Amino acid sequence: DFINAVNMAYEKEESKPAKDAMAQILINSRMCAEGHRPICQDTGIVTVFLKIGMNVKWKTKLSLNEMINEGVRAAYNHPDNKLRASIMDDPAGVRKNTGDNTPAVIHTEIVEGSSIDVQIAAKGGGSEAKAKFVMLNPSDDIVDWIVKTVPSMGAGWCPPGMLGIGIGGTAEKAMILAKSALMEPIDIQKLKERGAKTTTEKLRIEIYEKVNALGIGAQGLGGLTTVLDVKIKDYPTHAANKPVAMIPNCAATRHAHFVLDGTGPSFQTPPDLNEWPKITWDVGPTAKRVDLDTITSDDIKNWKTGETLLLSGKMLTGRDAAHKRIQEIIKKGDSLPNGVDFKNRFIYYVGPVDPVHNEVVGPAGPTTATRMDKFTEMMLDKTGLIGMVGKAERGPVAI
């Protein structure tokens, strides 16, 4: 459903930068399906929604959380498709990586029956960082708040994607509703064709149309499609409150839905490669080839805003944690470690997945550039760095 929705948006897109971005998403996602590797290195924190039949019996001494985390551990350390461990213990302190992407975030509901309904998502941190919540007054307009808030999210959530909206309950209930809404398949075009019949369906269409009218576009490059669908779940709330949560999903949408009935494992069928559109990406005659091994500051002065650059050569990688360590080294007056030389080099804001088999490097999607804004002046002034590669936007401090 997601590939079909991106392709539909690609076909109607009029902005060349946005159309190019969606072409690359479609082409790269097919390559990833062929190679059994993620399109982005951030395979996120595992979120699980369970509906457990009250007649289910367990043949194990493990707790429910232990069983799920054992599955996460096995999946993320699979030798043929090792995924990045992204989960930090002691989040307000030393932030030590747990090493196996556990623990998962688990939501459980007890229902009638003897089966287990499982919805599971591996959602990256870039889109999660743009989650929003507000406690509106009962008389306030939900759509107005969303249309005002979406531009403040920038492009770090990697559109085109989905918006999950949770309305009602309490503050924490609204957030859970928004997250669970993202598990639903894309069907906004079918809804528009048959027409809205409920309040939430009317809201879905109105938000979908007004957010896309903002012109943010794929990867924030300006265009017709920012959201591929809007999902809404609601819950009764207190008369004095109107809690609203909004959580976006990025272009690397990953979720699965299956049922365990006690007869054995549930096998997931990989998508048919024929489901991908047969498209090619033409970089155009104005694209510039850039050799990062020989580039100079004078070369960069000739670049123009909006140009397509085809990079080759070597570049360093690092995110805010690495930048903070560099900052501490420079403050102490110490030298950078042997082999770390930024003079006339580019840095790519990324933490790649470990390579498997004959890979040189694992999947490496860019990190939101604003995370490194506060280190930019130091890197340019103190290290000899001349270029940075990231996604989304830069803030006033960096600019």
Language-model segments: residues:
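Short, structured beta-strand/loop micro-motifs enriched in basic residues and often containing a Trp
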Residues: 285-295
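Short, well-ordered loop/turn sites that connect or cap secondary structure elements
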Residues: 302-303, 309
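A generic structural signal for short beta-strands and their flanking turns/coil linkers
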Residues: 161, 226, 286, 307, ...
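Non-transmembrane, aqueous-exposed alpha-helical and coiled segments at domain scale
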Residues: 1-281, 367, 379-381
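Feature captures the catalytic cores and cofactor-binding loops of soluble hydro-lyases/lyases
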Residues: 182, 186-215, 219-222, 317-399
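Short, conserved beta-strand edge motifs with alternating hydrophobic and charged residues
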Residues: 160-166, 311-312, 348-350, 387-391
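Short, charged beta-turn/beta-strand-edge "cap" motif at the junction between a beta-strand
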Residues: 308, 314-318
